[in-house]
Amino acid sequence: MNVPFWTEEHVRATLPERDAESHKGTYGTALLLAGSDDMPGAALLAGLGAMRSGLGKLVIGTSENVIPLIVPVLPEATYWRDGWKKAADAQLEETYRAIAIGPGLPQTESVQQAVDHVLTADCPVILDAGALAKRTYPKREGPVILTPHPGEFFRMTGVPVNELQKKRAEYAKEWAAQLQTVIVLKGNQTVIAFPDGDCWLNPTGNGALAKGGTGDTLTGMILGMLCCHEDPKHAVLNAVYLHGACAELWTDEHSAHTLLAHELSDILPRVWKRFE
């Protein structure tokens, strides 16, 4: 299967400029439902990725015990106490530019109830980690973006990992069409497949990303870029590209063994500037 690469030239042509006359409302408010008592860091990692990626304002809906752990590091966000639990009980009352749910959340029925309520919104929705399950998705205005690693793809589809890895692009494209979602199949040369049949490979990244938390950062980056890009496709593709490019810059100066996920967000401003 001949799948094109999303290249540096594509990124330069599609990354948005920051209008000098803009304000935070121009780029909208994003909602991140993430982080539990057992995995509090996921909310912080995704939040840092989002705040570095072009949004106007970020609301983090996380467990009450997680909030005081995050605020000293991410005071720029606002917080919705037990937000992901409350989203399971009722539909969202606020309007958001984009929503992400799943980093650091358990694989429970209540999380899937929160997913159901989130999907009633019109905006783009990212599902990651604990929000990924074998299910169907309603027809809606904004895209649904699934960000599985191979094990999560198996949980979603039943395709064994060893079989998936032989034909990554084919399976991602097939299931994107079947589920009518965007699928970001993470791994070496991440596959980004769209429900209309469009499919791309990402050329950036390296083994430094083979560490816990880097996927949470990517989810946050996609969330932020959905707020500053007009085209959701470009937002997803550019987020994946820059995420990998951050890892490449890291290994220009450090061992691939040593990257910590939060350092991707520290590196991102330098990488982004290269493409402006």
From Swiss-Prot:
One of its GO terms (biological process) is nicotinamide nucleotide metabolic process. Its EC number is 4.2.1.136. SUPFAM superfamilies: Ribokinase-like (SSF53613). (6S)-NADPHX binds at residues 42, 104, 149, 216. Signal peptide: none annotated. InterPro entries: Carbohydrate_kinase_pred_CS, CARKD, Ribokinase-like. GO terms for molecular function: ADP-dependent NAD(P)H-hydrate dehydratase activity; ATP binding; NAD(P)HX epimerase activity. AMP binds at residues 186-190, 215. Residues 7-275 form the YjeF C-terminal domain. It catalyses: (6S)-NADHX + ADP = AMP + phosphate + NADH + H(+); (6S)-NADPHX + ADP = AMP + phosphate + NADPH + H(+). PROSITE patterns: YJEF_C_1, YJEF_C_2, YJEF_C_3. Keywords: ATP-binding, Lyase, NAD, NADP, Nucleotide-binding. Gene3D superfamilies: 3.40.1190.20. It holds the Pfam family Carb_kinase. Its cofactor is Mg(2+). The keyword Lyase applies. It is an enzyme of class 4 (lyase). PANTHER family: ATP-DEPENDENT (S)-NAD(P)H-HYDRATE DEHYDRATASE, ATP-DEPENDENT (S)-NAD(P)H-HYDRATE DEHYDRATASE FAMILY MEMBER. Homotetramer. Belongs to the NnrD/CARKD family. Catalyzes the dehydration of the S-form of NAD(P)HX at the expense of ADP, which is converted to AMP. Together with NAD(P)HX epimerase, which catalyzes the epimerization of the S- and R-forms, the enzyme allows the repair of both epimers of NAD(P)HX, a damaged form of NAD(P)H that is a result of enzymatic or heat-dependent hydration. This is ADP-dependent (S)-NAD(P)H-hydrate dehydratase. The lineage of its organism: Bacteria, Bacillati, Bacillota, Bacilli, Bacillales.
